[in-house]
């Protein structure tokens, strides 16, 4: 089977690079590189968010995406194939009080994805993808009536075909699963 799952700290470039070498040694170059790891800050005005919490959020949400792309992309470019899907958020296109660090990290993902799309060979794709509003622990931490939104399991059934149907004309776009 052409799947592999492993828990790792994506903020650790060395760990991500070792994992990528392991994957590339076992399988062909990936058709899809999906970057979905993220954390959210505890609700607070920006000036009250502890430096360590802000830094760790950026390390995971932004640098983790970069680490994964940097570790896989050279091989993908060598074969001029692959779609890179970087999970963003509605808050990567708008803002909300109490979650400025999270919003800023998702705005970074939007910019990173668009810039990357301009650097890739014509046969490759990079998009920022907002999953829409889903009932998750992350949303629940914001006290936003998360239980009134779609459950992750039903969302995944719609998301998989959506992602598999991302086309070359979508390159550089900010997409949303609605």
What are these regions (language model features)?
Residues 44-46, 53-55:
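Substrate-binding pocket helix/loop in short-chain dehydrogenase/reductase
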Residues 94, 115-124:
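Active-site-adjacent segment of SDR/Rossmann-fold oxidoreductases
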Residues 7-18, 51:
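The beta1-alpha1 cofactor-binding region of Rossmann-like NAD(H)/NADP(H)-dependent oxidoreductases
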Residues 89:
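Residue(s) in the substrate-gating loop at a strand-loop-helix junction
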Residues 122-124, 128-129, 134-136, 144-178:
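C-terminal helical subdomain
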Residues 36-42:
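Conserved NAD(P)H cofactor-binding loop of Rossmann-fold oxidoreductase domains
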């Amino acid at each position: 089977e052409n799947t592999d799952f492993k828990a790792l700290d994506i903020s650790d470039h060395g760990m991500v690079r070792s994992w990528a070498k392991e994957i590339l040694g076992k399988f062909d170059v990936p058709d899809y590189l999906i970057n979905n790891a993220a954390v959210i800050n505890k609700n607070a005005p920006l000036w009250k968010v502890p430096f360590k919490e802000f830094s760790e959020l950026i390390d995971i949400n932004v640098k983790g995406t970069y680490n994964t792309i940097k570790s896989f992309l050279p091989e993908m470019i060598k074969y001029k194939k692959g779609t890179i899907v970087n999970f963003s958020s509605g808050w990567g296109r708008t803002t909300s009080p109490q979650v400025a660090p999270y919003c800023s990290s998702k705005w970074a993902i939007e910019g990173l994805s668009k810039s990357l799309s301009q650097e890739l060979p014509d046969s490759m794709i990079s998009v920022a993808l907002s999953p829409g509003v889903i009932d998750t622990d992350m949303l629940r931490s914001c006290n936003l009536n998360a239980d009134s939104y779609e459950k992750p399991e039903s969302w995944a059934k719609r998301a998989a075909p959506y992602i598999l149907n991302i086309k070359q004309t979508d390159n550089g776009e900010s997409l949303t699963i609605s």
